[in-house]
């Protein structure tokens, strides 16, 4: 048997192993666009444009929120991973509208005047299938404990519950 023929079983085994691993690996799902902007009113924390960044790994759907217009008030601070954030979005699926929520406790350390960075927040309420779209839950001002689209609950060292309302739809809805 020639040297090349002896390697054929090894090459076939390696190719089958790679194909099997690829077949079992979770695939990244597309969400478009990856970023969108919307305006939020967060009372004492400020009002203005926020950037929402979406991701779909195939096993987890997330949204990260950043804003230079919405900031921690002077004299306050937050330790890393001490802010619980919940974001409500309107979901449209096959012409039917409902709500989903993204929530998490992921943030860098922040102090008074710092722009907010919240998340990534994981999908925690509702489901999203391929082709579903999500957009801001636009509500009237002022935000309150029962009237909010985005809720920020800081716990350390400053304790505060900050309800926010979206005052605009996203620049483009996310299509999952």
Labelled PLM ranges:
Residues 1-30:
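Secretory targeting and sorting signals
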Residues 31-176:
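Primarily mature extracellular domains of secreted and cell-surface proteins
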């Amino acid at each position: 048997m020639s040297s090349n023929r002896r390697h054929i079983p090894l090459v076939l085994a390696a190719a089958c192993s790679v194909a099997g691993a690829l077949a079992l690996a979770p695939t990244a799902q597309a969400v478009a666009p990856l970023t969108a902007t919307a305006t939020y009113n967060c009372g004492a924390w400020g009002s203005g444009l926020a950037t929402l960044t979406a991701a779909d790994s195939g096993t987890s759907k997330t949204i990260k929120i950043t804003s230079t217009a919405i900031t921690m008030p002077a004299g306050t601070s937050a330790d890393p991973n001490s802010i619980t954030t919940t974001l409500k979005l309107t979901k449209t699926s096959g012409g039917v509208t409902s709500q989903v929520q993204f929530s998490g406790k992921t943030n860098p350390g922040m102090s008074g005047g710092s722009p907010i960075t919240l998340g990534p927040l994981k999908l925690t309420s509702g489901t999203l299938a391929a082709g579903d779209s999500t957009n801001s839950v636009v509500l009237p001002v002022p935000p309150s404990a029962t009237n909010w689209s985005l809720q920020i609950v800081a716990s350390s060292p400053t304790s505060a519950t900050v309800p926010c309302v979206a005052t605009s739809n996203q620049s483009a809805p996310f299509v999952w």
